[in-house]
């Protein structure tokens, strides 16, 4: 069975056999539509069903209002007939192929209380292509976890990852207690549609915890291109000592178009900077977001709160781009 899937407004058409999800069918056809977690948790792959029938698995993201508007999640919906969808298509990703690469642990640096910065070296013949902001799956002993790439494309070709230690986490135990330098690992990627869009709007980057990793990659890429858009970086942490890098402050000192505000959400008597929820700090400085693009990476709760509050302060819904951390299943 071959079913046609037509995307609007691009007019792109691909086929599905009805047994794979709409998202997987699209990616198998090298058609890149919005997605992130691929398991129905983050909601990035939300699309509007214009016509046709789909079989959708249960998910916790779509509201009754979403369903009434015809919204589906392409990562957990399968086509039952020819269908038409209102969903973004990204030709910028058409030249990028997801592959599995061998790599070695070139270095590991433990910073702060619970963060490890990994540098992975690929073979000289393995040239991974990605857009700043995308993520990879790190594969160790048959297990995998998704991590955002923390450095811009180019450089020495290494892949930088920022990993937070999770209490009783199997993968965390491997990374923090068992990994050895030069150990052979594998990565699969790149994945995701989290990258900087090419327009002239000023940018707000919103990061929670190690959500700073893709922000670092995207800002580095903007600097490398000498992009002069106004960039506002807000990075939230529970306490002042949790900030594990000073590079954002260095950017702000060196580049007049880059502005940086670290925000502490917890009780820290030594902290003299911005406090509270990191997205609320944005609204205190920029109460009207109607002329901005926002890129947010962090917990699902942070992403959801930021999206709702930012839209209420003028941000166009299609100008909010996010990559939410979701728990491993």
Swiss-Prot record:
Disulfide pairs here are none
Which CDD domains does UniProt cross-reference here? fer2, flavin_oxioreductase
The segment(s) forming the FAD-binding FR-type domain are 98-197
InterPro entries reported in the protein's UniProt record: 2Fe-2S_ferredoxin-like_sf, 2Fe-2S_ferredoxin-type, 2Fe2S_fd_BS, Beta-grasp_dom_sf, Cbr1-like_FAD-bd_dom, FAD-bd_FR_type, FNR_nucleotide-bd, MRET
Keyword annotations for this protein, in alphabetical order, are: 2Fe-2S, Electron transport, Iron, Iron-sulfur, Metal-binding, NAD, Oxidoreductase, Transport
SUPFAM superfamilies reported in the protein's UniProt record: 2Fe-2S ferredoxin-like, Ferredoxin reductase-like, C-terminal NADP-linked domain, Riboflavin synthase domain-like
Q: Does the keyword Iron-sulfur apply?
A: yes
What is one Gene Ontology biological process annotated in the Swiss-Prot or TrEMBL record?
lipopolysaccharide biosynthetic process
Note the Gene3D superfamilies from the entry.
3.10.20.30, Nucleotide-binding domain of ferredoxin-NADP reductase (FNR) module, Translation factors
Question: EC no.?
Answer: 1.17.1.-
Q: Name one GO molecular function term.
A: 2 iron, 2 sulfur cluster binding
- Domain 2Fe-2S ferredoxin-type per the UniProt entry, residue ranges: 2-93
Top-level taxon in the UniProt lineage: Bacteria
Query: Which residues does the record give as [2Fe-2S] cluster binding sites?
Result: 37, 42, 45, 75
In which pathway does this enzyme or protein participate? Nucleotide-sugar biosynthesis; CDP-ascarylose biosynthesis; Bacterial outer membrane biogenesis; lipopolysaccharide biosynthesis
How does the record describe its quaternary structure? Monomer.
Function as written in the Swiss-Prot or TrEMBL entry: Participates in the conversion of CDP-6-deoxy-D-glycero-L-threo-4-hexulose to 3,6-dideoxy-D-glycero-D-glycero-4-hexulose together with CDP-6-deoxy-D-glycero-L-threo-4-hexulose-3-dehydrase (E1) in two consecutive steps. The detailed mechanism of E3 is not yet resolved.
The entry's protein name is CDP-6-deoxy-L-threo-D-glycero-4-hexulose-3-dehydrase reductase
Originating species: Yersinia pseudotuberculosis serotype I (strain IP32953)
């Amino acid at each position: 069975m071959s079913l046609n899937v037509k995307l609007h407004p691009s007019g792109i058409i691909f086929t599905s056999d009805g047994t794979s999800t709409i998202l997987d069918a699209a990616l198998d056809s090298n058609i890149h539509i919005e997605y992130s977690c691929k398991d129905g948790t983050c909601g990035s792959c939300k699309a509007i069903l214009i016509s046709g029938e789909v079989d959708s698995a249960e998910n916790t993201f779509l509201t009754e209002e979403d369903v009434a508007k015809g919204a589906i999640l392409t990562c957990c919906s399968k086509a039952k007939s020819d269908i038409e969808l209102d969903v973004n298509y990204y030709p910028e990703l058409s030249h990028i192929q997801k592959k599995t690469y061998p790599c070695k642990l070139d270095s590991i640096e433990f910073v702060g209380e619970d963060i490890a910065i990994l540098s992975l070296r690929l073979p000289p013949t393995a040239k991974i292509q990605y857009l700043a902001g995308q993520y990879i799956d790190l594969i160790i002993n048959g297990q995998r976890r998704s991590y955002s790439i923390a450095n811009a494309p180019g450089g020495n070709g290494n892949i930088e990852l920022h990993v937070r230690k999770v209490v009783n986490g199997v993968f965390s135990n491997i990374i923090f207690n068992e990994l050895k330098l030069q150990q052979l690992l594998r990565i699969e990627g790149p994945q995701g549609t989290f990258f900087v869009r090419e327009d002239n709007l000023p940018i707000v980057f919103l990061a929670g915890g190690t959500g700073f990793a893709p922000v670092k990659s995207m800002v580095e890429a903007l600097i490398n291109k000498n992009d002069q858009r106004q960039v506002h970086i807000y990075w939230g942490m529970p306490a002042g000592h949790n900030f594990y890098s000073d590079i954002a402050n260095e950017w702000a000192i060196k580049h007049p178009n880059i502005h940086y505000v670290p925000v502490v959400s917890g009780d820290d008597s030594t902290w003299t900077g911005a406090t509270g929820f990191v997205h609320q700090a944005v609204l205190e400085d920029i109460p009207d977001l109607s002329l901005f693009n926002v890129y947010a990476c962090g917990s699902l709760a942070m992403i959801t709160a930021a999206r709702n509050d930012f839209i209420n302060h003028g941000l166009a819904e299609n100008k909010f781009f996010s990559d939410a951390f979701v728990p491993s299943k």
